[in-house]
Regions:
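A structural signal for multi-pass alpha-helical bundles of membrane permease subunits
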Residues: 1-194
Length: 194
């Protein structure tokens, strides 16, 4: 039992546990929330729908290490990154994301990677919804918001459960994104249990 006692009394363990829970919870909220909204949006016909869907699912096919390197050096770098250039263009000081907001940076990267998965599952569920239900609701005077909350969202319940379950399994073992971008730092700011 000495090992368990050491684990429970180790402050690094508790910081890592909290970081893991924050990472998993935040990514789930972002991917399920945005995935649901994008699924409803992509269910509507619009010009270039096929290309838009292809671009929306593309991040899922990028390796985690490559994704982390792209975000670290191309997007979030304070001097050479797109976000730094955008900040300077708007007259603000560029933000060193990985030094000032390490956990938020990792959450954004991992959310960007897992949003396509949630979108695919939820879009499939939205497309399986019978149009007669929506039409009947429309004839009864239900607006778009009422249709979303009383027809679409309840229909997505099982799909949302699947997304949460599968993403949780994989998010508990996120390692590459953290190691490549922050190495768990500064200090223990982005260290997780993996």
């Amino acid at each position: 039992f000495d090992n368990y006692e050491f684990l429970v009394t180790d402050p690094d363990f508790w910081a890592s546990l909290v970081n893991t829970l924050v990472l998993v919870g935040s990514v789930l909220v972002i991917t399920v929330g945005l995935g649901t909204l994008l699924a409803v949006l992509y269910d509507q016909p619009f010009p270039g729908q096929g290309v838009a869907r292809l671009l929306a699912i593309a991040p899922f096919f990028v390796m985690p290490t490559v994704s982390a390197l792209v975000w670290k050096n191309l997007m979030m770098h304070p001097i050479y990154g797109v976000l730094g250039a955008l900040s300077r263009g708007l007259g603000f000081e560029p933000v060193d994301w990985f030094a000032e907001y390490p956990m938020l940076s990792v959450i954004l990267i991992v959310s960007w990677q897992w949003l396509p998965f949630a979108l695919l599952i939820l879009l499939t569920a939205v497309q399986s919804l019978d149009n007669e239900q929506k039409e009947a609701a429309r004839m009864d005077g239900a607006g778009a918001v009422a249709q979303f909350f009383f027809i679409t969202l309840p229909h997505l319940g099982r799909a949302i459960s699947v997304v949460i379950m599968i993403e949780t399994i994989f998010l508990l073992s996120v390692f590459a994104e953290i190691y490549v971008t922050t190495s768990g730092g500064p200090g223990l700011a982005s260290t997780n249990l993996a």
